[in-house]
Amino acid sequence: NYMKPKLLYXSNGGH
């Protein structure tokens, strides 16, 4: 999920 908001980066590790 690289196109998703930065709020998800924390959970997805930037994926």
UniProtKB/Swiss-Prot annotation:
Keywords: Angiogenesis, Cytoplasm, Developmental protein, Differentiation, Growth factor, Heparin-binding, Mitogen, Nucleus, Phosphoprotein, Secreted. It comes from the Eukaryota. It is found in: Secreted; Cytoplasm; Cytoplasm, Cell cortex; Cytoplasm, Cytosol. One of its GO terms (biological process) is positive regulation of cell migration. Its main location: secreted. In the nucleus, phosphorylated by PKC/PRKCD. Plays an important role in the regulation of cell survival, cell division, angiogenesis, cell differentiation and cell migration. Functions as a potent mitogen in vitro. Acts as a ligand for FGFR1 and integrins. Binds to FGFR1 in the presence of heparin leading to FGFR1 dimerization and activation via sequential autophosphorylation on tyrosine residues which act as docking sites for interacting proteins, leading to the activation of several signaling cascades. Binds to integrin ITGAV:ITGB3. Monomer. Homodimer. Interacts with FGFR1, FGFR2, FGFR3 and FGFR4. Affinity between fibroblast growth factors (FGFs) and their receptors is increased by heparan sulfate glycosaminoglycans that function as coreceptors. Found in a complex with FGFBP1, FGF1 and FGF2. Interacts with FGFBP1. Part of a Cu(2+)-dependent multiprotein aggregate containing FGF1, S100A13 and SYT1. Interacts with SYT1. Interacts with S100A13. Interacts with LRRC59. Interacts with CSNKA, CSNKB and FIBP. While binding with LRRC59, CSNKA and FIBP seem mutually exclusive, CSNKB and FIBP may cooperatively interact with FGF1. Belongs to the heparin-binding growth factors family. This is Fibroblast growth factor 1. It comes from Canis lupus familiaris. The gene is FGF1.
